[in-house]
Amino acid sequence: MGYFVGRMTNPTRIAAALCAALLWAPAPFGSLDPAVAGPVVVSTEAAAPPATQPAAAPRGRAYLFRGALGPIFSRGMDSLTEKLENVGIPANVYEFTICPLIAERAIRDYREDPAPIILIGHSMGGLCAVKFAEMLEAEGIRASLVVAIDPAHVTPEVPLNVDRFINIFLAKDVLGGGDVKAKAGFRGHYASFDLSQHDEVLHINIEKNDTVQEQLVNKVLQLATAKAEGDPLPIRYVVPPHAPIELWDSGMAVFARPGDSMQSIAQAYHVPLWSIIQMNKGADRTPLVPGERVIVPRHLEPPLVAVSGQVPSRQ
């Protein structure tokens, strides 16, 4: 519980810390039967390809977790699970309270049938997703994709076994607001998106955002083919209030040519100017110095659908 020290600045955070402590206590959760504990299973196993066809690349297993009072406030996890199932990704949704038990089961399943592991959680479920990844790390297993959606403030740092991490949060929110960092030495793809300037986005509807859900489904579908050249650079954004919510995977370094400016680089890489300015403080000169390094956000694979500017209504 060392990561709770100094974090309990208000009653809401104290409650979140207590929930986290109960969640990761060795008992009684380790003995729970998920059939009794009540995860709502929305998935079925994906159908096997015809015998005459070559085996498809493994598309992974997705484990999704609701937050506190999840059946009331985290229903977006259920709809996201259904969307993953509809495109052939085995996916289950659970209450965060049985997270350790599900992680133990996932480890056993992986030993029998290795497949990419995807972890997605909302609120306390976001904390669960990161702790789940820590359990995998202890067993020498990688997590292909971890997504935290407005996770609890007490969420720990991202462990080194995570290939891709995305944090979508509301910095000023007392129910979530977890600004999750990665551990020193992290070499995976890291992207953090603060939506606090989007007034229409709340803790209780952020996981229901159709634009966010569609992009996450795309990222899961592209796990087998997503590649990137060069070392990934972490990116952290405060998304402007009227900007579409676009979930890049990480950043990459490009080098200015004679006559280049922030505007010309943004146009060349098809990204909004604000995304270049935020990641390159102090480099707003025009023109840039030839050879100057500029960090540009990127997708590991082109989005399967265009990112829309639609935002969720208050629900």
PLM regions and their residue ranges:
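Signal peptide processing junction and immediate N-terminal pro/mature segment
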Residues: 26-41
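Intrinsically disordered, low-complexity Ser/Thr-rich linker and spacer segments
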Residues: 236-253, 297-315
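Bacterial N-terminal signal peptides that target proteins for export
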Residues: 4-18
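Serine-dependent carboxylesterase/thioesterase catalytic core
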Residues: 59-62, 81-84, 91-96, 104-183
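Active-site catalytic motif of lipid deacylating hydrolases and related acyltransferases
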Residues: 42-45, 49-115, 202, 238
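Lipolytic serine-hydrolase domain surface
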Residues: 69, 77-79, 160-236
